[in-house]
Amino acid sequence: MSFDSGLEELSEKFYKLKHLLEDPSQLSVESFVNASKEYSELLPIISVIDEYNAVQKDIKDLQELINNQETDTELKNLAKEEFYELQKQLPKVKHKLKLSLLPKDKDDARNAILEIRAGTGGEEAALFVTDLYRMYIKYAEKKNWKIEQINSSSTGIGGHKEVSLCVSGSNVFAKLKFESGVHRVQRVPETEASGRLHTSAATVAVLPEIEEVDLKIDEKDLRIDVYRSSGPGGQSVNTTDSAVRITHIPSGIVVIQQDEKSQHKNKNKALKVLRARLYDLEKQKRDAEISQLRKSQIGSGDRSERIRTYNFPQSRITDHRINLTLYRLEDIMKEGDLDELIEALIAEDEANKLKNLNI
């Protein structure tokens, strides 16, 4: 099927749905809901198809005007100018149309659970977790997103073994999902007298936040333990059993939550993280089974994959998946100026998907 005939088919489908929805009495409730959903999904695509068809029609009309022997010189020159402008515009509109045809990730509009954990490198890795945490906070502020800290485990001297956040707002998961993976830092620690460069790492996991209605967890699959919360060094910071550890027996996933003074709040936060991890586990299994989807991903999608290096002496950040190097480390780390990196990753992902669509 040619590109243009495929567009005609989509348009026909859209107008059939529109006609159906104009008289909902002939549809069952379920059919009406499904038709409405499909109509809403096609609406923005049809808008771009109409724009593409209009540009093509204008080019054709102008070509006929230019080729017409009876067209006077002044009008012909004006037509030529407009014709060349539209010729330049057409590839951009076609690219925009192709992007609108790409399969959508249904999780893109969701909020996200962001988990940052120290990897190799001891205290330096823990300090790097704090740096990444602050970077994402700054980025979220720029996007007017809401941040809720779910859990944190500090080292007591400025570092964190791990931090978990819930980030809420517009298209959060779409923007943050490519941050999952191993982030590596190269810098000279303040305590390093010889000035030797150290390499440390932290792992970032970005999970779509899943509502309770979207994923039901059977209570009998859970083991819930409560105990007193502890601070750096293991000292008790609470006199009541407010900390909660939930084990999902079938998967072996364990979630610990102790930031809140209330056991009830800790349990709710732990269940929120558990839902996200279970959903992510199923999603990874699904993706692994679909080779085409794997080909369209940036990098391998493996959480153990090294995705980015932050080199402080050179003020350099390199994203290894797209071979992009920026010499703006301070802007990115301290100000959360991540847009250039994130937009480049999104563009690469779209380019890969376009290749797979073969259009």
Curated annotation (Swiss-Prot):
Cellular component GO terms held in the UniProt record: cytoplasm
Compartment(s): Cytoplasm
One Pfam family, short name: RF-1
Keywords from the named record: Cytoplasm, Methylation, Protein biosynthesis
GO MF assignments: translation release factor activity, codon specific
Principal subcellular localization: cytoplasm
Highest taxon in the source lineage: Bacteria
Residues bearing the modification N5-methylglutamine: Q235
Transmembrane segments annotated in the record for this chain: none
Family: Belongs to the prokaryotic/mitochondrial release factor family.
Function: Peptide chain release factor 1 directs the termination of translation in response to the peptide chain termination codons UAG and UAA.
Name assigned to this protein: Peptide chain release factor 1
Organism: Ehrlichia ruminantium (strain Gardel)
Organism phylogeny: Bacteria, Pseudomonadati, Pseudomonadota, Alphaproteobacteria, Rickettsiales
